[in-house]
């Protein structure tokens, strides 16, 4: 994938960059693998906003992606197309299985149409093949990783993401995740060889507010410019300070650096090293 840069012939195009979509081979999805996508606009069943700054966006259909590769064990499949998916940054690949079934999977980097892949404990270590973690050699890059065997992949699914197999001991396999966290997984958990495609997704510059609106993202208003009835940071004359020991959410809970993880979370036993710390305070400590 490459990034296309434009000449600044309008203000909205000056900072704009887009993917060149070089890996895409068709612009029409497999109709049997799509369904309607109802946009809930961040509301619950009562119409109350539960997730702020959501709403609008371009109409789209949801592509049904197969995250449980182990459900098609020992059945070879040929990569038919690589397609754009409006619901995620990663591309998706359409597989034609030898038994006649069609399924979408996340498109691994460098996987091209015509390649034959398979999910099997005895599959070769090649990009696109899925194997149990216990069968994957140390140092191999993987993605689309299961947390619970047979439940389907839940980790390492974002565009450009990959984890690395760093150790094996008994029934557990140690992976280094994209966040820097080192974590234990059951050796029966399936993972796909390689890195998720569209690795340049993080380098795309939207260039204007309208492109965020196309994605269904609404403006983010700072609490300090609200009225006190709307946010604890609001009110005062001019640019007033927060007036509290630290920043809080609209509901008065501490935020920006405040730890919210449960102290007795069961998965703590599987985490060898916590992820890298992110410093949100450094990017303007009053944005809640």
UniProtKB/Swiss-Prot annotation:
Residues 210-221, 272-288 have a biased composition (Basic residues). One of its GO terms (molecular function) is transferase activity. One of its GO terms (cellular component) is large ribosomal subunit. This is Large ribosomal subunit protein uL2. One of the primary rRNA binding proteins. Required for association of the 30S and 50S subunits to form the 70S ribosome, for tRNA binding and peptide bond formation. It has been suggested to have peptidyltransferase activity; this is somewhat controversial. Makes several contacts with the 16S rRNA in the 70S ribosome. InterPro entries: NA-bd_OB-fold (IPR012340), Rib_uL2_dom2 (IPR014722), Ribosomal_uL2 (IPR002171), Ribosomal_uL2_bac/org-type (IPR005880), Ribosomal_uL2_C (IPR022669), Ribosomal_uL2_CS (IPR022671), Ribosomal_uL2_dom3 (IPR014726), Ribosomal_uL2_RNA-bd_dom (IPR022666). PANTHER family: LARGE RIBOSOMAL SUBUNIT PROTEIN UL2M, RIBOSOMAL PROTEIN L2. Residues 29-43 have a biased composition (Basic and acidic residues). Belongs to the universal ribosomal protein uL2 family. Residues 29-59, 210-288 are annotated as: Disordered. It holds the Pfam family Ribosomal_L2. Disulfide bonds: none annotated. The keyword Hydrolase does not apply. Keywords: Ribonucleoprotein, Ribosomal protein, RNA-binding, rRNA-binding. SMART domains: Ribosomal_L2, Ribosomal_L2_C. Part of the 50S ribosomal subunit. Forms a bridge to the 30S subunit in the 70S ribosome. NCBIfam families: rplB_bact. GO terms for biological process: translation. The gene is rplB.
């Amino acid at each position: 994938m490459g990034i296309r840069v434009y000449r600044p012939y309008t203000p909205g195009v000056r900072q704009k960059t887009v993917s060149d979509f070089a890996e895409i081979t068709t612009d029409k999805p497999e109709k049997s693998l799509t369904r309607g996508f109802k946009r809930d606009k961040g509301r619950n069943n009562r119409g109350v906003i539960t997730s702020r700054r959501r709403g609008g966006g371009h109409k789209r259909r949801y592509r049904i992606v197969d995250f449980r590769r182990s459900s098609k064990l020992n059945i070879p499949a040929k990569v038919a197309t690589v397609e754009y998916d409006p619901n995620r940054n990663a591309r998706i690949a359409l597989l034609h299985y030898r038994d006649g079934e069609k399924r979408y999977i996340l498109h691994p980097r460098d996987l091209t149409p015509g390649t034959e892949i398979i999910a099997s404990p005895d599959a070769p270590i090649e990009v696109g093949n899925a194997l149990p973690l216990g069968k994957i050699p140390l140092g191999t890059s993987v993605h689309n990783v299961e947390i619970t065997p047979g439940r389907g992949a839940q980790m390492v699914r974002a565009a450009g993401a990959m984890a690395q197999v760093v150790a094996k001991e008994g029934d557990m396999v140690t992976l280094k995740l994209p966040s820097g966290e080192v974590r234990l997984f059951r050796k029966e958990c399936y993972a796909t060889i390689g890195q998720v495609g569209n690795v340049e997704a993080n380098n795309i510059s939207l260039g204007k507010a309208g492109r965020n609106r196309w994605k269904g993202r609404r403006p983010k208003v700072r609490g300090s410019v609200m009225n006190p009835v709307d946010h604890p940071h609001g009110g005062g004359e001019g640019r007033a300070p927060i007036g509290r020991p630290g920043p809080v959410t609209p509901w008065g809970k501490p935020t920006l650096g405040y730890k919210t993880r449960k102290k007795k979370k069961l998965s703590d036993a599987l985490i060898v090293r916590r992820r890298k710390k992110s410093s949100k305070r450094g990017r303007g400590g009053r944005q809640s």
